[in-house]
């Protein structure tokens, strides 16, 4: 019989499909198993409606057979099968799906889920095969038919000899090449692992005869050398029932923990398990996990976020990044949905309304679980925060604060009050009477923040100080701007304003009286500071650095640490303590030794920078200046 040409621009489509659509050749097995499952679904559904088959779910199966000698991989099902016309229509026209037609005809009825919404999955077999033979017999038909093809040239359909309804697909696996080791698809271990990965939750048993060995009876004992014999045993490769579809009462915490550790390669139990399912505009089940600790590569560019995505129990994407916002990228888990729109390959999802709906609901669910943990299990939440708090704070700052309102109440900060982190709400709730701002300081550690000269004035007032020790912290607070109408105030910014009206008046008078001194020091530090002024925030320290404008000293350090970026310098102000003995020395130098005043100004400036955590440009020069006045 002459070969028939494929329809629907077959050569172009098949070439595109084999070489472009699928990025991993191994998914051919997933596609063929899904097709077999669809065929069984159709027969089961027909029997359910018409009561004609006399078959129950227990009667159905999918079988895989491997033959290394003939280099064939065979997949057999006892599903609905196909007539000659169905073989011609479904396999002769690329991108036509019998499953899609069946689904459309029955979409208003309650019944089984049909996976294969596009008729291209079958042709993925040609990625690994030099020839494909399909033997099929429709349920209730008296004759069988065989469809066979070697690829782009075309196909032929001839009478077949298959007994019993169903379909048998035999692939002749290609020879190995320089880059492709096709023989892997003839190895039982490799094939069983692919089934486990992609098709573990197909609802029908996927069986394969496994070659095994055992100790020969009468050997290995009484001084006899052990001898082994080979035997074959048929095994079911898939678990069939997804753990996320089982009732909560049927699943123990231990089961979920073990599933997580096996599935996501963690040696620790998860910190939190989140189970959720929704019906309606987007129907899905999700099983999510918050790890106990961050992966080694979590805060690197190499880390890939995403949830496993299943369509009716079939894995179609290992890491679907679109299901998680960046702020919750630490979450691991999976989503299973019947409603996702698939494009021509199950590997590449259309960014459609369904996916966005699911992602939005998952985001709210995760945020709700974190809030619940914060309120009801503070110790566990603080454990979570140690691993992933940085990501939440990045989430507040990211995208110009798009998610700041959803995340601000999840944030924790260390403070001057004890060794436990506090929320912004807790800080505001215990603010002192008359306190109008939320005060914070920045440094490499809590101890460094508390040692800042300006912190003394806050302690004297009894005000709590938030201690920001991560690079992103101040950027996050700048995006928030305020919390419960209380503005955030960096204690190292100019104009801390902790003085009484009487103290302010005295400061004005002192500034006027020592105007010449301040101008001389400002000239001595020209190009380094914008201004030298008297401070009302210093107690025991002689001087400190404050900043004016949008860029603080801490932000300057962070921005300048980034590669390939133009250097930025904050507008610095040197503030002097008029009540410190050093100030009297400065006043004397201004009158008696103006040239020495420049040296003192540079030393005070360098000292203030060091206290603020800023590295000196020339430490050796600073040390020499310091020694010269000792």
Task: Provide a role label for each language-model segment.
Residues 1-188, 193, 216:
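GHKL (Bergerat-fold) ATPase N-terminal catalytic module, capturing the glycine-rich phosphate-binding loop
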Residues 114, 135-154, 174-630:
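GHKL/Bergerat-fold ATPase module in large chromosome/replication-associated machines
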